[in-house]
Regions:
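Post-cleavage N-terminal segment of exported redox proteins
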Residues: 2-67, 110-182, 304, 309-328
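Secretory-pathway/luminal and periplasmic proteins that interact with or process carbohydrate-rich
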Residues: 66-68, 87, 92-98, 155-160, ...
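Short, solvent-exposed loop/turn and secondary-structure capping segments
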Residues: 71, 96-102, 160-164, 205-209, ...
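Short acidic alpha-helical/loop segments enriched in Asp/Glu that coordinate divalent cations
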Residues: 165-167, 199-214, 253-255, 280-282
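A cross-kingdom marker for long, charged
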Residues: 273-280, 285-328
Length: 328
């Protein structure tokens, strides 16, 4: 049911990488303007620049085979799990509302509330590496980083600087007035998600003896999944991604899960055990800029960790708005 990864920070561009940011997804009710079409990689020349873009595509679609924890060259073991970036950035980052990577070249550098400073596109890639991929940062001057950035830049072909293209993020469905229910979500998971991701959430390996072959269907929790600092570990990101993309192959124009089912199954999945990221208390140094569904403290609003995890989020946002008004 789920090809995974996400979290957005401040603007729609931050809704981009594998499993790590937080912020603003586009509202599906907004006009689909400006339009965008996928650049064709086959039209690229086989020169060094074209080959670097192709290398970036390979890294997105088969991350585990190039920089995963089981690759032969230990110096290349940057990722800490055997996922692929395209588990979350569907169709190699080209699917509308499948957390696409298009149009991002002109949106960086940008301010990140999570980091509390301006970040580059390379910083954003490394946020995914350390959160969604549960690994370590790529050197900025490494071949792999240059290839990632070259592919993202290629997907921005034709986009104007500062232009937010239609389809970024994972969509935006109405939130529940109640808390999402992980108990009900468990039943939804068993019925809808387990056929692909297994009842224990551990996914399906291509070869159980060769982890660097990756997964047919990725794990949604457990030691080889994204960590608790990733964007997919937050309910709003996960539930919207599921509603508009899952089971795999679903189009955002014809969701197969109801909104209620998506919220509840999201609550179930994010409640499951996964790797722990250190120093999460340092995220969002401005506590009033912390999104309502970040499932780890500290918080400035007085609400419980449980409500930040499952909602409802409206009362949290209202409290934050009051605190901001008082501060100003």
């Amino acid at each position: 049911m789920l090809r995974i990864f996400l979290r957005t920070q401040s603007v729609a561009a931050a809704l981009i990488f594998l499993f790590a940011c937080h912020g603003q997804a586009q509202d599906l009710r907004s006009p689909a303007d400006p339009a965008w079409s996928v650049p064709q990689m086959g039209a690229l020349p086989y020169d060094p620049a074209g080959m670097l873009v192709r290398r970036g595509h390979d890294l997105i679609t088969a991350t585990y085979a190039h920089i995963g924890p089981a690759v032969a060259d230990e110096a290349k073991r940057y990722a800490g799990n055997n996922l692929a970036c395209s588990n979350c950035h569907l169709n190699a980052g080209t699917k509308k509302f499948g957390i696409p990577l298009w149009g991002l070249k002109g949106l960086f550098p940008q301010y990140s509330f999570e980091a509390g400073k301006e970040i580059s596109i390379e910083d954003r890639v490394n946020s995914c590496m350390t959160r969604s991929m549960n690994g370590k940062p790529l050197p900025v001057d490494s071949e792999e980083m240059k290839a990632f950035v070259a592919f993202i830049d290629f997907l921005s072909t034709g986009a104007k600087r500062g232009e937010t293209l239609s389809g970024l993020g994972a969509g935006k469905m109405p939130e529940l007035k109640r808390a999402a229910d992980p108990v009900r979500g468990k039943a939804v998971y068993a019925r809808t998600c387990a056929p692909c991701h297994q009842l224990d959430g551990q996914g399906v390996l291509r070869d159980r003896h060769l982890l660097n072959f990756g997964y047919v269907n990725p794990p949604l929790w457990g030691p080889d999944s994204f960590n608790d600092g990733a964007g997919m570990a937050t309910l709003i990101a996960f539930a919207n991604f599921v509603h508009f993309n899952m089971p795999n192959g679903t189009s955002y124009t014809h969701p197969r899960l109801t909104q209620q089912d998506a919220w509840d199954v999201g609550a179930y999945v994010i409640s499951q055990p996964r790797p722990k990221r250190a120093d999460l208390d340092k995220d969002f140094p401005d506590r009033l800029a912390k999104p309502a569904d970040i499932p780890y403290g500290p918080y400035a609003d007085g609400f419980s960790q449980k409500q930040h995890m499952y909602g409802p989020f409206g009362p949290i946002r209202a409290a934050i708005a009051r605190l901001k008004a008082k501060k100003n």
